[in-house]
């Protein structure tokens, strides 16, 4: 249960990657959020039952994909590359992500941010984000040289501008 959002949570499948990218961005940018910065992601659920169901289903799915026989079965049953949602489904999709920034020294400074995307998150919106990152790399003068950078640390504010202008993302501060 997440006390800040007042909802039950379950693991978010992309958290294993996203959390590392966010923490690396903090380090590459010189720790603007502090060296004690913490970041985590979870899926908000409507009820305790839904949180338990989603957690169990995700765990069973991961175990099944780790075992040879069930992985082979899953490969036969799950969609193949290129067999994802239809164009209509991608265009009808959307998502909302809520972030809560917590200032442990003064909780009155906590901030809630909502990000909304106007397409399916797994296909449409991700493709737009990748496309706008490519435009930044091709057209903008970057403040960084070669190496392994995160989008936030290499693409600066131009990327955020492109995401809101051309990729269908809306960033909104709800509480501050």
Placement of each model-derived feature along the sequence:
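C-terminal catalytic/substrate-binding lobe primarily of soluble NAD(P)-dependent oxidoreductases
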Residues: 1-176
């Amino acid at each position: 249960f997440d006390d800040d959002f007042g909802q039950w949570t379950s693991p978010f499948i992309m958290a294993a990657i996203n959390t590392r990218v966010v923490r690396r961005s903090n380090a590459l940018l010189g720790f603007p959020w502090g060296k004690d910065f913490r970041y985590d992601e979870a899926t908000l659920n409507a009820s305790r039952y839904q949180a338990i169901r989603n957690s169990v289903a995700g765990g069973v799915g991961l175990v099944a994909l780790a075992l040879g026989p069930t992985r082979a079965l899953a490969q036969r049953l799950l969609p193949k590359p290129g067999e994802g949602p239809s164009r209509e489904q991608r265009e009808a999709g959307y998502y909302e992500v809520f972030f809560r920034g917590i200032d442990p020294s003064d909780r009155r400074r906590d901030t809630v941010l909502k990000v909304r995307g106007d397409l399916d998150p797994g296909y449409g919106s991700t493709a737009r984000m990748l496309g706008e990152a490519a435009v930044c790399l091709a057209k903008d003068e970057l403040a960084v040289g070669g190496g392994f950078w995160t989008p936030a640390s290499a693409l600066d504010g131009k990327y955020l501008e492109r995401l809101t202008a051309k990729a269908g993302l809306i960033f909104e501060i709800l509480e501050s």
